[in-house]
């Protein structure tokens, strides 16, 4: 982070703009909106600046820049077309420890003016640290279209309610009130239509509702790793959670979307190494929900595909704890797509099977004759430890040794690696990758030669 985002209170505080052209006009308009005491220093001024000066909105010093003008200033903006003057302003401001913005010169800025979306008192500021101002403006236009005008009124209303809401003794109940207020569709419509009386009645209803927090658990699929594959609903749940209980397979990029003041509890486990037993996880979810918290149980991939999500929900259902499920993109879909391997294809596979590499006893017990039939795709989850057994059983039951296979390590992530070869090499190929890895078996693997769009540089051919 090159610049810390910071909103400054400049009301009635002296600031200086060096320059009198169109850029100075734009900067002065922003500072006047912030109610700053603006001084313009330039020998010649744009008509708009002269007009503001005549109205008494700003002060003019019609002379060349001299360092004494910086005395007592909180901020200075250099907006001249003379690089040597801008450099002098920057040097003198730095010497006095005054924030300085030199227009179109990021290297000479101790402060950056962002692209702004104004829904006062709600403000959204976007900055590229001066490296791509046009990109910041384009993002502002996109976000501007998403934010309704009444958000400013809603923020003002929230400010008026702060003291009343502080009187609610329970911290979680206070946060629940704010969540209901900001997502209240009827209130939003009333504010947008200017129906102030009706809006106040809606707020009164919310304040009079029982404030007792009722806990619940939401089972959320985090997807296979790439945070861009997290669903919109999943993202919303992470932003609303009081507690997030997560597994080893959840990427740091996904965890970065968790609400900052939410408690994070790691319960990671892998085959043969359960740092937190499943029963303890079930009990943890119960305890947190009974405390009135909104709990997110975050699992890699999809929680209902080899994720033991069903077992956890059974425990919650038996205890009468409210729960819901947000599906995720399962590892088979994500890893195959990011490896250029379509799981089904009319010329190759009319069926796909997802198979766990080990059951709850740690064994791999399968209907091998059914798995060894042609024109299908097999996807083994958690199968690395049994790669040799998978190879032997499939070949023994009739699947040719030349059947293409792929092992996808860290699928969909920047670290993704794909090792491809033949079924008769599977045990050997498994030594070239680490967990978490997925095994894909079937002729669809050959299509990766043409369809690999994501990780060509990280794809290895089998021996």
Curated annotation (Swiss-Prot):
Transmembrane regions listed in the UniProt entry: none
Binding site for S-adenosyl-L-methionine: 224, 300-302, 305, 330-331, 382, 411
Catalytic activities: uroporphyrinogen III + 2 S-adenosyl-L-methionine = precorrin-2 + 2 S-adenosyl-L-homocysteine + H(+); precorrin-2 + NAD(+) = sirohydrochlorin + NADH + 2 H(+); siroheme + 2 H(+) = sirohydrochlorin + Fe(2+)
A GO MF label: NAD binding
Gene3D superfamilies linked to this entry: Cobalt-precorrin-4 Transmethylase, Domain 1, Methyltransferase, Cobalt-precorrin-4 Transmethylase, Domain 2, NAD(P)-binding Rossmann-like Domain, Sirohaem synthase, dimerisation domain, Siroheme synthase, domain 2
CDD domains: SUMT
Region listing for Precorrin-2 dehydrogenase /sirohydrochlorin ferrochelatase, in residue ranges: 1-203
Pathway the protein acts in: Cofactor biosynthesis; adenosylcobalamin biosynthesis; precorrin-2 from uroporphyrinogen III: step 1/1; Cofactor biosynthesis; adenosylcobalamin biosynthesis; sirohydrochlorin from precorrin-2: step 1/1; Porphyrin-containing compound metabolism; siroheme biosynthesis; precorrin-2 from uroporphyrinogen III: step 1/1; Porphyrin-containing compound metabolism; siroheme biosynthesis; siroheme from sirohydrochlorin: step 1/1
Record-linked InterPro entries: 4pyrrol_Mease, 4pyrrol_Methylase_sf, 4pyrrole_Mease_sub1, 4pyrrole_Mease_sub2, CobA/CysG_C, NAD(P)-bd_dom_sf, Siro_Cobalamin_biosynth, Sirohaem_synt_dimer_dom_sf
Listed Pfam families: CysG_dimeriser, NAD_binding_7, Sirohm_synth_M, TP_methylase
Range of residues in the leader sequence: none
Positions that bind NAD(+): 22-23, 43-44
Region of interest (Uroporphyrinogen-III C-methyltransferase), residue spans: 215-463
The enzyme's E.C. designation: 2.1.1.107, 1.3.1.76, 4.99.1.4
Record-stated family: In the N-terminal section; belongs to the precorrin-2 dehydrogenase / sirohydrochlorin ferrochelatase family. In the C-terminal section; belongs to the precorrin methyltransferase family.
Function: Then it catalyzes the NAD-dependent ring dehydrogenation of precorrin-2 to yield sirohydrochlorin. Finally, it catalyzes the ferrochelation of sirohydrochlorin to yield siroheme.
Protein name from the UniProt record: Siroheme synthase 1
Species of the source: Aeromonas hydrophila subsp. hydrophila (strain ATCC 7966 / DSM 30187 / BCRC 13018 / CCUG 14551 / JCM 1027 / KCTC 2358 / NCIMB 9240 / NCTC 8049)
């Amino acid at each position: 982070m090159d610049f810390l985002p910071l909103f400054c209170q400049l009301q009635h505080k002296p600031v200086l703009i060096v320059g009198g052209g169109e850029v100075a006009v734009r900067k002065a308009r922003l500072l006047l909106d912030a109610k700053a005491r603006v001084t313009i220093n330039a020998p010649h001024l744009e008509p708009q600046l002269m007009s503001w000066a005549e109205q008494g909105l700003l002060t003019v010093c019609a002379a060349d820049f001299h360092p004494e003008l910086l005395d007592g200033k909180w901020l200075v903006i250099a907006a001249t077309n003379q690089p040597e003057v801008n450099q002098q302003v920057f040097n003198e401001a730095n010497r006095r420890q005054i924030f300085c913005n030199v227009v179109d010169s990021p290297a000479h800025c101790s402060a950056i003016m962002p692209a702004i979306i104004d829904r006062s008192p709600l403000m959204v500021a976007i900055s590229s640290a001066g490296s791509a101002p046009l990109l910041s403006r384009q993002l502002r236009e996109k976000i501007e279209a998403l934010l309704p005008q009444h958000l400013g009124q809603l923020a003002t209303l929230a400010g008026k309610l702060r003291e009343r809401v502080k009187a609610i003794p329970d911290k979680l109940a206070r946060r629940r009130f704010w969540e209901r207020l900001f997502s209240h569709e009827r209130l939003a419509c009333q504010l947008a239509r200017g129906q102030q009386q009706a809006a106040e009645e809606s707020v009164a209803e919310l304040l009079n509702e029982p404030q007792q927090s009722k806990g619940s658990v939401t089972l959320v699929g985090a997807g296979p790793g790439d945070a861009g594959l997290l669903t919109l609903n999943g993202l919303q749940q992470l932003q609303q959670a009081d507690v997030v209980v997560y597994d080893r397979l959840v990427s740091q990029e996904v965890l970065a979307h968790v609400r900052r003041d939410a408690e994070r509890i790691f319960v990671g486990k892998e085959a043969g190494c359960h740092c937190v037993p499943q029963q303890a996880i079930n009990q943890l979810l119960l305890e947190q929900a009974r405390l009135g918290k909104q709990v997110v149980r975050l699992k890699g991939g999809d929680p209902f595909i080899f994720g033991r999500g069903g077992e956890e929900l059974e425990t919650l259902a038996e205890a009468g704890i409210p729960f819901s499920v947000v599906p995720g993109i399962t590892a088979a879909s994500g890893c195959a797509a990011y490896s250029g391997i379509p799981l089904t294809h009319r010329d190759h596979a009319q069926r796909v099977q997802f198979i766990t590499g080990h059951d709850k006893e740690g064994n791999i017990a399968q209907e091998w004759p059914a798995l060894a039939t042609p024109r299908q795709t097999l996807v083994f989850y958690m199968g690395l430890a049994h790669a040799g057994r998978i190879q032997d059983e499939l070949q023994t039951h009739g699947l040719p040794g030349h059947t293409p296979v792929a092992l996808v390590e860290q699928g969909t992530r920047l670290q993704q690696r794909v090792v491809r070869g033949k079924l008769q090499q599977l045990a050997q190929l498994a030594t070239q990758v680490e967990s978490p890895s997925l095994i894909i078996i079937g002729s669809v693997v050959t299509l990766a030669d043409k369809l690999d769009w994501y990780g060509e540089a990280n794809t290895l051919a089998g021996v």
